[in-house]
């Protein structure tokens, strides 16, 4: 847990989508940038430009995907695509909090015409497809740590 000396919250202009920046300065004067959702795919560039313009250290310490609607995670797909391609204006993301719907949250017996855990897992993860990319696959290919923080709500 970060002990904050100062912080501010920004709600970014991404149309009907969602994207929030939580910027924290801890008691040792270290800066922490948390991005909560990232709007649609096209909003990824807008968010990168905003962070580069207004923040000294263009690194996202924590990226949080609140749920798997593309107007919440699509911008992350764009940002990771740029990072994967080695684009000069790409921004490093150090960690993700994102649920993986393929991580045994679905009972195979509840899915018609499927009787294999790997098939169910792969189909469930397709919910994060955007353009010809998949958010979870991009995160993993870039070796960015990802943690499930909202998993309890799935089973309740």
What kind of feature is each model-predicted range?
Residues 1-8, 77-156:
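Flexible, acidic/histidine-containing loops and adjacent segments that form or flank the divalent-metal
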Residues 2-59:
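Conserved beta-strand hairpin/beta-sheet module of binuclear metal-dependent hydrolase folds
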Residues 32-33, 59-62, 91-95:
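Residue-level recognition of the N-termini of beta-strands and the immediately preceding loop/turn
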Residues 36-41, 68, 100-101:
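Active-site metal-binding loops of divalent metal-dependent hydrolases
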Residues 42-46, 71-74, 106:
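Residues that form or flank phosphate/diphosphate-binding pockets in enzymes
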Residues 47-50, 75-79:
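A short acidic, amphipathic alpha-helical/loop segment
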Residues 60-71:
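Metallo-beta-lactamase
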């Amino acid at each position: 847990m970060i002990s904050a000396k100062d912080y501010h919250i920004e709600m970014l202009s991404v149309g009907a989508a969602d994207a929030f920046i939580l910027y924290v300065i801890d008691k040792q004067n270290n800066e922490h940038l948390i991005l909560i959702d990232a709007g649609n795919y096209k909003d990824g560039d807008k968010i990168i430009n905003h962070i580069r313009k207004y923040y000294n250290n263009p690194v996202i310490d924590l990226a949080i995907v609140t749920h798997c609607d593309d107007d919440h995670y699509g911008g992350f797909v764009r940002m990771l695509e740029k990072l994967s391609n080695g684009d000069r204006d790409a921004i490093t993301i150090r960690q993700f909090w994102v649920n993986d719907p393929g991580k045994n949250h679905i009972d195979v017996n509840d899915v018609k015409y499927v009787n294999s855990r790997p098939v169910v897992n792969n189909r469930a993860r397709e919910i994060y497809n955007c353009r010809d990319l998949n958010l979870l696959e991009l995160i993993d290919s870039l070796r960015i740590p990802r943690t499930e923080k909202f998993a309890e709500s799935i089973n309740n």
